[in-house]
């Protein structure tokens, strides 16, 4: 980098170099000499222009002598005119004769009488001047504004008479202190002054090298953390100055540069008024005050007046740079604050965003859009009026070329008169010339597409109906903009890359986006429906032509079921489907079209054709599909009448029943049997139930009406318009409505829209409707801001190389939450490259080898083989120095091919996440206690077959003989099937190496068999404990090293299901299965073929023919294998003991046939518990004693109506002095103490004797308040901003055993002692509930308290891979629930950008300081440099930075400054002399050159031209 800089020479600002000649951009602080070198003269007068002659005043702010002539090549007095005098300086008015363009870059200066501080370096935090001098910002401001004195040389001065408290250099004294001290010590060399001069002197005197060395020593010596922080801050500023070659005193201005006049113009308005740029007013105030100060100094005015004038000068310069930063803003004539230089560049209206990143362009126009159903996919209709304007220069050239016009003037005239030749030429110009159409808001790359224009009459642009969904356009008055690409390159790009017929797939997910919608779907749906008893039924037709003839002769109904010949066999279809078949390519299998086509089916059909036929075939097919859809929708003429909206007859009665049920609940509540919360929940449940059952009846009714030809049903069923929820409101009942705070009103709207609402119901409805509209407006803004942040953080990720050569990757598996599948494995691995081989879990052979790109077939194959997790190459583990490599990215979703070098994948990723943002909800869901009985889990049930294994599980057997779970965590129940059995009796040996586990059974003297297992295939302890990862499909070792086994015992097992404690089975649940018990289920064949039975011997299967249909299985390790015709294994099924076999050996079976089944068909329950309360159970036998359980104070007596007993219940609020508890004195004399929570109900009496596992008390779960769940957009931005949640949960940093130390200031001290002697301490707040107890074993990443887990903690405890997994699955959860498909890779790219910074822990021999936060790239470059010199490299830890901070902290100055915090970014960059290498997109857009992606990445010297031989 420094090498690179040595070869660069600075360019003058006004040089004629082109943007492509700029190699890099560096910001520095300007020295006074530099300012003078820029200047063309001093501005002495505040005047602007003469009011009579309107000529600029000499030496004023618009002076022509300084800044250059006003008219091109003409001096001010008019003595010299025309080009021939170029460069002459007029002796009369002093103006150089040259182009007036120089007024845009010639600068002037103002010679300030007193040095003035630059406000950016004073008030922009951290204050740079203050930091250097070690003075507080407030004190520094007091000195600069002449309110306090700063000491330069203290002499012998001290604050007291004894000299014990001496005055130090840089002390700030107020007026009183100064008067006192100077009267006593004034003649002993005390020098203390106020104002800019003294600050400038102090800065000039600093010896930075010396200070740097001194501070480096101090930082080693100091122990206090706070002191270290301040020293590091100072070190950073000093280091920045040393590196950049800036001098500290340059932060004080003595020469103020004056902006070129054309950049702060004076514009004359009609009516003789002038609109003047605010900057001019601010400059005028500076000049006025400076001139006045000059006079006062010359007159030797009293100190106090001069001082006041200097202060005012400082304020005037402050206002010029950043008005309103300090004190009140300076206001103009119209009472609004003037816009200072800072405001001119920052914000949406500032230079960066308004003029540099977004410019208005010529050759563009906009108009309303209308639908153009007769257009081809790559066409749009362009009004002739617009075309004639847009293509005017092209048109004029064409008219001349064809000889219709001799001069341009004549051509122009012809165009104005619109003679016939003009139209003829226009047709020729427009032919084959693409135009770009854009619809705002431009949310993703499909919002700008290219079309070939077709000239049309009228004034509206015609748009092809299939591209509407990409533009998100409709025809209710939307407008679109047209742009004409001018250069050959732009035209080529538009034709090759941007034509609408090329952009059929959505870059976010790779699914087709240009698919028919609405009317077209309705037409195609109707076309493929079947009707009974119509003309031409069951007739046989040879081909489509015959069908069409019959149809036109009205001998055949469109929906008649007919027979036809397909692939040489007779198949049934309908007339309509055969007509559709005529436009479908021949290679499409029957299953795609010979059925009723709904929206999803049409999407699948298009996807299939794209996959096989490619882009051009698909585009043609889509056009045909569109035409056919519209044609039949028109022919059919589906319409809705009131009679189509059927109301089910049972509605009345059902509503009545619900009302009765509600009355009953109210009665119970009045009798005191229910709490208010329970009553509310039950009522809501009753109405929800009623609504659902009415809706079900209604949908059934509509489906059967008219044999499925009911218009309402057709529209909703096909996916053309409307949904079940809307039909329910039309003719079912409107249902429950929400209040403004999100809670549900318990009286529902029982009417529907067909019956009409009464006034009250209508009133309740208006609220929801209005909230919907308000939400939408807010949502759009939020989603837009999120997109902008994402673009900014990801814009510099581009594909920079083909393969970075890494073997690392990220392990992915299904994303499942509870029982809901969020994203299946096949979706996650599609389009990615493998980092490790995929091994078939059954046959252990390599299914897919490393480095393979996974297509759809492979993905499905992998999922069907039962693979649970796959290691993929990922952006996060890519080792490319800049950007990312193609292999780690995978498929380019937009064209289904491997991504090419130069693809701007970062921007695509940001668009893919941001664009659907507007479809997400804005709500934070208040679950507000709607925890209904139906929702709570009360048991877990096995869904697969196998046998039970307890993992780490200890149980109590209570007095009734039931098994009770005794572990609180780090245990579980597994359902497994055998994988390897011991072939002999003996001792097990397990040896763990780096990546393998070798297991063997000792065999006296004989050769023992060893089994090698991949370490990654075996479930780790934290996975078994339910903390991390998925365990299904992993291997489980039931034995430990040194255990004895019998022959035939299983030593390696495959986990089929797992229920960890406490996340799936709570503490103190009742277990329904013993360890080792078989679990039988109905086993269905996964494939078609022949069944063969085998027994497991060691790790291979041995044929077994002692089984026939009807047998009950007694053998262990019996497998049924289904083989296909080639005798290859197609499916393997474990048959557990106790099953009844349903097929004979060697029997032929179809897919889905039953192979075996349990004797009795009942669910196998693994464990059960009470879902509403958490029990406290006795861990041993003993005697109880109550503590602080005092009736009337901490507990109340409750009379139980059912049993007639009284029980004690703790109060909700317990006085602070009391800590209610039960202690259990065991027989061994040990005391166990159980702390009791509020609302707990006691089941025992004081002094009672209890047995093991007896229930002592129960705490109701309802008392644990349900938290608001953040969902939708706020959740996404919370994840990407890496905010620390308010209600944060503590998580374990290491694996170890929990204990509690002595509390600190009312906080509990939780200690984890690790296996290798590490110890971590954490403090738990009073209002948090600890989820762990003394002596329990926890794994890193496990929650220790309730609350929300922070992503920063996941990174610290579990590392980067776990964090990736967390962010990706959390973001996917939000989008998938809204039905939005986004490929993981997009989310991963943004996440890897959030991880691009590291925090230095040890600096080694590098230039870093511990605690520095720097980009990974800088860190690696510096370490390589240090290692090359033989030094000690620095050590850093990964950091997670929110996207806003990551964007502001970008390596590029321009990109960071144009995003947010402009002044802050520019301030720190100028001091550090940061160099912007112009490597990314934004910077290059700003300086106006090609962006370095795609062909822009290839430097011009890489392309060599050579003469043809």
Swiss-Prot record:
Domain of life: Bacteria
Binding sites annotated in the UniProt record for Zn(2+) 2: 804, 878, 885, 888
Presence of keyword Membrane: no
GO CC, one annotated term: DNA-directed RNA polymerase complex
Binding site for Zn(2+) 1: 75, 77, 90, 93
Cofactor-binding details, from the entry: Binds 1 Mg(2+) ion per subunit. Binds 2 Zn(2+) ions per subunit.
Pfam families reported for this sequence: RNA_pol_Rpb1_1, RNA_pol_Rpb1_2, RNA_pol_Rpb1_3, RNA_pol_Rpb1_4, RNA_pol_Rpb1_5
Binding site for Mg(2+): 474, 476, 478
Reactions performed catalytically: RNA(n) + a ribonucleoside 5'-triphosphate = RNA(n+1) + diphosphate
Gene3D superfamilies associated with the record: 1.10.132.30, 1.10.150.390, 1.10.1790.20, 1.10.40.90, 2.40.40.20, 2.40.50.100, RNA polymerase II, clamp domain, RNA polymerase Rpb1, domain 3
Keyword line: DNA-directed RNA polymerase, Magnesium, Metal-binding, Nucleotidyltransferase, Transcription, Transferase, Zinc
GO molecular function, a single term: DNA-directed RNA polymerase activity
Cofactor entry: Mg(2+); Zn(2+)
This enzyme's EC code(s): 2.7.7.6
GO biological process: DNA-templated transcription
CDD domains: RNAP_beta'_C, RNAP_beta'_N
Residues in coiled coil: none
NCBIfam families attached to this UniProt entry: rpoC_TIGR
Task of the protein: DNA-dependent RNA polymerase catalyzes the transcription of DNA into RNA using the four ribonucleoside triphosphates as substrates.
PANTHER family per UniProt: DNA-DIRECTED RNA POLYMERASE, DNA-DIRECTED RNA POLYMERASE SUBUNIT BETA
Family to which the UniProt record says this protein belongs: Belongs to the RNA polymerase beta' chain family.
Subunit structure: The RNAP catalytic core consists of 2 alpha, 1 beta, 1 beta' and 1 omega subunit. When a sigma factor is associated with the core the holoenzyme is formed, which can initiate transcription.
Protein name: DNA-directed RNA polymerase subunit beta'
Organism: Sulfurovum sp. (strain NBC37-1)
């Amino acid at each position: 980098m420094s090498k690179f800089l040595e070869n660069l020479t600075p360019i003058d600002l006004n040089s004629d170099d082109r943007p492509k000649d700029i190699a890099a951009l560096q910001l520095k602080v300007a020295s006074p000499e530099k300012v003078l070198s820029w200047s063309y003269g001093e501005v002495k007068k505040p005047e602007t222009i003469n009011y009579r002659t309107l000529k600029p005043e000499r030496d004023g702010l618009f002076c022509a002598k300084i800044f250059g002539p006003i008219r091109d090549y003409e001096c001010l007095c008019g003595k010299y005119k025309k080009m021939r005098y170029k460069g002459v300086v007029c002796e009369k008015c002093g103006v150089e004769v040259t182009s007036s363009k120089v007024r845009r870059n010639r600068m002037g200066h103002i010679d300030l009488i007193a040095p003035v501080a630059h406000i950016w370096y004073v008030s922009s935090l951290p204050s740079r001047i203050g930091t250097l001098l070690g003075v507080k910002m407030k004190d520094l401001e007091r000195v600069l504004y002449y309110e306090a004195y700063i000491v330069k040389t203290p002499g012998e001065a001290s604050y007291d008479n004894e000299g014990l408290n001496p005055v130090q250099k840089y002390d700030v004294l107020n007026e009183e202190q100064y008067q006192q001290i100077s009267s006593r010590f004034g003649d002993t060399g005390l020098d203390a002054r106020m104002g800019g001069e003294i600050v400038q002197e102090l800065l000039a005197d600093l010896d930075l090298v010396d200070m740097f060395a001194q501070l480096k020593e101090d930082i080693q010596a100091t122990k206090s953390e706070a002191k270290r922080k301040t020293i590091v801050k100072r070190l950073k500023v000093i280091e920045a100055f040393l590196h950049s070659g800036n001098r500290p005193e340059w932060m004080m201005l003595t020469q103020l540069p004056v902006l070129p006049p054309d950049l702060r113009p004076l514009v004359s308005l009609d009516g003789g008024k002038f609109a003047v740029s605010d900057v001019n007013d601010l400059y005028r105030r500076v000049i006025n005050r400076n001139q006045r100060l000059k006079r006062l100094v010359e007159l030797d005015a009293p100190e106090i007046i001069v001082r006041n004038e200097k202060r005012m000068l400082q304020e005037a310069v402050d206002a010029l740079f950043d008005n309103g930063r300090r004190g009140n803003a300076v206001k103009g004539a119209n009472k609004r604050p003037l816009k200072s230089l800072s405001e001119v560049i920052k914000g949406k209206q500032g230079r960066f965003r308004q003029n540099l990143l977004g410019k208005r362009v010529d050759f563009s126009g906009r108009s309303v859009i209308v639908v153009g159903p007769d257009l081809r996919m790559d066409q749009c209709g362009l009004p002739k009026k617009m075309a004639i304007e847009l293509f005017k220069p092209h048109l004029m050239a064409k008219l001349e070329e064809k000889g219709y016009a001799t001069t341009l003037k004549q051509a122009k005239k012809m165009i104005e008169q619109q003679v016939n030749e003009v139209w003829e030429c226009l047709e020729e110009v427009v032919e084959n010339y693409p135009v770009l159409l854009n619809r705002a808001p431009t949310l993703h790359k499909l919002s700008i597409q290219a079309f070939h224009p077709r000239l049309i009459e009228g004034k509206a642009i015609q748009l092809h109906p299939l591209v509407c969904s990409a533009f998100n356009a409709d025809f209710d008055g939307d407008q679109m903009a047209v742009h004409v690409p001018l250069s050959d390159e732009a035209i080529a790009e538009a034709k090759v890359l941007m034509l609408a017929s090329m952009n059929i797939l959505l870059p976010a997910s790779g699914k087709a986006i240009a698919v028919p919608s609405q009317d077209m779907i309705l037409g195609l749906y109707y076309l493929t429906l079947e009707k009974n008893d119509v003309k031409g039924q069951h007739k046989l037709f040879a081909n489509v032509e015959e069908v069409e003839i019959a149809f036109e002769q009205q001998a055949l109904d469109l929906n008649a079921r007919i027979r036809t010949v397909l692939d040489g066999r007779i198949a049934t279809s309908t007339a309509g489907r055969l007509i559709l078949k005529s436009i479908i390519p021949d290679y499409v299998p029957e299953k795609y079209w010979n059925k009723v086509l709904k929206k999803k089916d049409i999407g699948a059909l298009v996807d299939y054709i794209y996959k096989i036929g490619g882009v051009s075939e698909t585009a043609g097919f889509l056009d045909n599909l569109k035409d056919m859809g519209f044609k039949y929708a028109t022919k059919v003429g589906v319409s809705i009448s009131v009679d189509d909206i059927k109301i089910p007859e049972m509605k009345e009665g059902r509503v009545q029943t619900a009302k009765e049920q509600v009355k009953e609940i109210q009665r119970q509540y009045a009798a005191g049997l229910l709490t208010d919360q329970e009553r509310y929940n039950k009522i809501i449940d009753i109405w929800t139930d009623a609504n659902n059952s009415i809706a079900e009846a209604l949908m059934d009714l509509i489906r059967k009406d008219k044999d499925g030809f009911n218009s309402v049903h057709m529209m909703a069923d096909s996916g053309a318009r409307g949904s079940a929820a809307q039909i329910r409101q039309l003719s079912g009942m409107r249902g429950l409505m929400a209040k403004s705070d999100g809670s549900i009103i318990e009286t529902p709207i029982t009417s529907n829209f067909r019956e009409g609402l009464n006034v009250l119901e209508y009133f309740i409805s208006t609220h929801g409707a209005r909230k919907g509209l308000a939400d939408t407006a807010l949502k759009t803004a939020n989603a837009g801001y999120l997109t902008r942040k994402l673009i900014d953080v990801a814009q510099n990720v581009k594909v920079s190389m083909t393969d970075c050569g890494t073997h690392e990757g990220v392990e992915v598996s299904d994303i499942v939450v509870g029982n809901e599948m969020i994203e299946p494995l096949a979706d996650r691995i599609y389009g990615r490259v493998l980092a490790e081989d995929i091994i078939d879990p059954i046959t252990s052979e390599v299914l897919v080898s490393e480095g393979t790109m996974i297509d759809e077939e492979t993905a499905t194959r992998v999922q069907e083989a039962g693979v649970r997790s796959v290691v993929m190459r990922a952006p996060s583990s890519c080792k490319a120095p800049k950007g990312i490599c193609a292999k780690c990215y995978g498929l380019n979703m937009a064209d289904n091919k491997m991504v090419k070098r130069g693809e701007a994948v970062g921007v695509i990723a940001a668009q893919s996440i941001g664009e659907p943002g507007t479809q997400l909800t804005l709500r934070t869901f208040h679950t507000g206690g709607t925890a209904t009985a139906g929702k709570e889990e009360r048991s877990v049930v096995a869904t697969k077959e196998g046998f039970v294994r307890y993992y780490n599980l200890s149980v109590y057997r209570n007095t009734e003989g039931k098994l009770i779970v005794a572990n609180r965590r780090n245990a579980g129940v597994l359902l497994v099937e055998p994988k390897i059995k011991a072939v002999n009796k003996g001792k097990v040996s397990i040896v763990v190496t780096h990546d393998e586990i070798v297991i063997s059974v000792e065999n006296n003297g004989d050769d023992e068999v060893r089994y090698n297992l991949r370490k990654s295939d075996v479930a780790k302890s934290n996975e078994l404990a339910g903390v991390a990862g998925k365990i299904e499909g992993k291997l489980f070792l039931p034995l430990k090293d040194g255990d004895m086994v019998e022959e035939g015992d299983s030593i390696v097992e495959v986990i089929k299901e797992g229920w960890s404690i406490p996340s799936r089975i709570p503490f103190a649940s009742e277990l329904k299965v013993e360890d080792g018990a078989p679990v039988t289920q109905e086993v269905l064949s996964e494939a078609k073929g022949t069944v063969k039975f085998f027994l497991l011997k060691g790790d291979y299967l041995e044929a077994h023919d002692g089984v026939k249909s009807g047998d009950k299985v007694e053998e262990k390790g019996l497998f049924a294998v289904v083989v296909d015709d080639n005798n290859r294994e197609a499916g393997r099924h474990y048959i557990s003991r106790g099953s009844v076999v349903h097929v004979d050996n060697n029997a032929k079976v179809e897919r889905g046939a039953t192979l075996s089944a349990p004797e009795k068909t009942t669910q196998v329950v693994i464990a059960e518990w009470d879902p509403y309360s958490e029990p406290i159970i006795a861990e041993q036998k003993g005697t109880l004693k109550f503590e602080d359980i005092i009736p009337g104070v901490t507990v109340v007596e409750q009379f139980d109506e059912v049993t007639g007993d009284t029980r004690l219940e703790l109060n909700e609020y317990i006085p602070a002095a009391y800590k209610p508890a039960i202690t259990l004195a065991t027989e061994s004399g040990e005391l166990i103490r159980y702390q009791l929570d509020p609302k707990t109900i006691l089941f025992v009496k004081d002094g009672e004797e209890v047995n093991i596992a007896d229930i002592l008390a129960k705490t109701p779960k309802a008392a644990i308040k349900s938290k608001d769940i953040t969902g939708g957009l706020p959740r996404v931005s919370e994840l990407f901003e890496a905010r620390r949640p308010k209600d944060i949960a503590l998580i374990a940093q290491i694996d170890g055993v929990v204990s509690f130390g002595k509390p600190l200031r009312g906080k509990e001290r939780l200690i984890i002692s690790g296996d290798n002697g590490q110890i971590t301490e954490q403090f738990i707040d009073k209002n948090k509930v600890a989820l762990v107890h003394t002596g329990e074993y926890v794994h890193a990443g496990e929650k220790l308290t309730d609350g929300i887990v922070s992503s920063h903690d996941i990174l610290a405890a579990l590392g980067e891979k776990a964090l990736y997994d967390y962010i990706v699955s959390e973001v996917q959860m939000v989008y998938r629930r809204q039905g939005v498909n986004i490929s993981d890779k997009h989310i991963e790219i943004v996440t890897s950008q959030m991880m691009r910074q590291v925090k230095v822990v040890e600096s080694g021999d590098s230039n870093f300081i511990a605690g520095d936060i720097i980009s990974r790239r800088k860190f690696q470059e510096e370490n390589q440099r240090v290692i090359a010199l033989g030094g000690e490299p620095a050590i850093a830890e990964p950091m997670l930075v929110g996207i806003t901070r990551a964007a502001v902290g970008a390596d590029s100055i321009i990109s960071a400054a144009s995003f947010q915090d402009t002044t802050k970014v520019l301030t720190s960059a100028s001091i550090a002399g940061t160099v912007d290498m112009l490597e990314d997109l934004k910077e290059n857009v700003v300086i106006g050159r090609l962006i370095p992606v795609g062909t822009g990445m290839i430097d011009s010297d890489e392309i060599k031209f050579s003469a043809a031989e």
